Amino acid sequence: MSIEDLARANVRALTPYQSARRLGGKGDVWLNANEFPTAVAFQLTEQTLNRYPEPQPKAVIESYARYAEVKPEQVLVSRGADEGIELLIRAFCEPGEDAVLYCPPTYGMYSVSAETIGVECRTVPTLADWQLDLPGIEARLDGVKVVFVCSPNNPTGQIIDPQSMRDLLEMTRGKAIVVADEAYIEFCPQATLAGWLSDYPHLVVLRTLSKAFALAGLRCGFTLANAEVINVLLKVIAPYPLSTPVADIAAQALSPEGIAAMRQRVAQILDERRYLVEQLRGIACVEQVFDSETNYVLARITASSAVFKSLWDQGIILRDQNKQPSLSGCLRITIGTRAESQRVIDALTAENV
């Protein structure tokens, strides 16, 4: 019997999540992972590396609670928001019995986490405007324990209609957990659902320091939920999810000075997004640029696969979305520096397709 044969059957059938880093490339313009384009400097202040870290670092929890305007007991910190996704499925879904539901085109880790754990994935594609198909969701809710909704949605960039979210929360009350993935909420803070926690005991909000806080390499995320949900998740999370250096840097990022710096970065990205969108809409091979509330834009490109490869060969790495439902011909472009935007603009302008 081979090692492969010893693995669980569902694991043998898995295809690993195709992250930007896994897909690789040898570019010098990296616009495929929705990262902040330049590094932010931090100094380590904690020198107690001979001791295990706090299971849930108090300074980080309290700082994030103040920032998100929730109570500390409503905050769980984890190794990125991706760990929060996995914890929710592990805690609330029985493998082989329960299901999760999500609405493509959307973030790929919902399915990867569920499939790894052995939980059924159900999909209800979004409508033509990428909003929720509420009747379709209601028809498929039987046996569903967790519903994932990404807002703003990755990769399409739009906010999910708040009334649709309220309708979904009423529809699932007493039946399922509803997870609002707000990885990109700093770019449209008015759209957060964190203030709804008191109204909906089954609402969970996922957050991260990877995007606007410019700390993708830190792997630090947050789950916001009512204390009853947090207490369930504390039963399944690893004892020390954040190393001491990670907690140290996260606390600095969440200081008043750190939050002010983040908001300056957001303003910078929004300015650059306006410039890039304006320029893209004047390029011959760009058929459509969709409105975005995030640090990336989705564009439909003539001969997109060939254009993607052409830019790849020039060292400009974008994210091909052709395999996502309803996104034929689409490429996703992270907002970078002005120089990086200009590289994309010049390369697309030169395409003869």
Curated annotation (Swiss-Prot):
Q: Does the keyword Amino-acid biosynthesis apply?
A: yes
Q: Which InterPro entries does the annotation name? A: Aminotrans_II_pyridoxalP_BS (IPR001917), Aminotransferase_I/II_large (IPR004839), HisP_aminotrans (IPR005861), PyrdxlP-dep_Trfase (IPR015424), PyrdxlP-dep_Trfase_major (IPR015421), PyrdxlP-dep_Trfase_small (IPR015422)
Query: Which keywords does this chain's UniProt record carry?
Result: Amino-acid biosynthesis, Aminotransferase, Histidine biosynthesis, Pyridoxal phosphate, Transferase
Q: What is its EC number?
A: 2.6.1.9
Catalytic EC class: transferase
Q: Name one Pfam family in it.
A: Aminotran_1_2
Question: CDD domains of this UniProt entry?
Answer: AAT_like
- Pathway entry: Amino-acid biosynthesis; L-histidine biosynthesis; L-histidine from 5-phospho-alpha-D-ribose 1-diphosphate: step 7/9
**Record-annotated disulphide pairs:** none
Tell me the cofactors it needs: pyridoxal 5'-phosphate
Q: Which family does it belong to?
A: Belongs to the class-II pyridoxal-phosphate-dependent aminotransferase family. Histidinol-phosphate aminotransferase subfamily.
Subunit comment for this entry? Homodimer.
Q: What is this protein called?
A: Histidinol-phosphate aminotransferase
Q: What is the lineage of its organism?
A: Bacteria, Pseudomonadati, Pseudomonadota, Gammaproteobacteria, Enterobacterales
